[in-house]
């Protein structure tokens, strides 16, 4: 078990991501069944690229719990900004298509319209660049994280 005083921002981010998933899962399942039962229309968006940037703060805002989480972190003396910055940016594309896909998905979530985004589940994002002995070297960007799905 990780003690709060010793937890890194990445460990706190991972724990918070798990709590968020548990928080919305039942509602998501109920809504999905209601959509099916009522034969409501659902938007489906397909894209081979997705460039959403960091999503933690937007997701907390859309769930209506951003202020609650910030207050809780303040009580625990945890720097919320550090945790937000610990989120790995999924670089799953390199241009306009990825940003467009992310904007569509964000709009659906923010407005509450039912929709699903579909794409390829890449193990690695865009490559990372490093300079080694004066030469540029490309390395894989393992965006998946320790849990494989945060």
Please identify what each model-predicted range represents.
Residues 1-150:
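A conserved ligand/cofactor-binding region detector
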């Amino acid at each position: 078990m990780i003690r709060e005083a010793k937890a890194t921002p990445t460990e706190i981010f991972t724990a918070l991501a798990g709590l968020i998933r548990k928080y919305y899962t039942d509602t998501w399942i109920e809504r999905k069944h209601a959509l099916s039962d009522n034969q409501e229309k659902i938007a489906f968006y397909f894209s081979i690229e997705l460039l959403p940037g960091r999503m933690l703060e937007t997701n907390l805002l859309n769930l209506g719990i951003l202020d609650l989480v910030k207050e809780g972190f303040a009580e625990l003396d945890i720097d919320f900004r550090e945790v937000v910055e610990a989120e790995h940016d999924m670089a799953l594309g390199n241009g306009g298509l990825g940003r467009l896909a992310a904007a569509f998905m964000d709009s659906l979530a923010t407005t509450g319209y039912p929709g699903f985004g579909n794409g390829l589940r890449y193990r690695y994002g865009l490559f990372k660049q490093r300079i080694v002995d004066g030469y540029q070297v490309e390395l894989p960007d393992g965006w998946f994280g320790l849990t494989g799905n945060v």
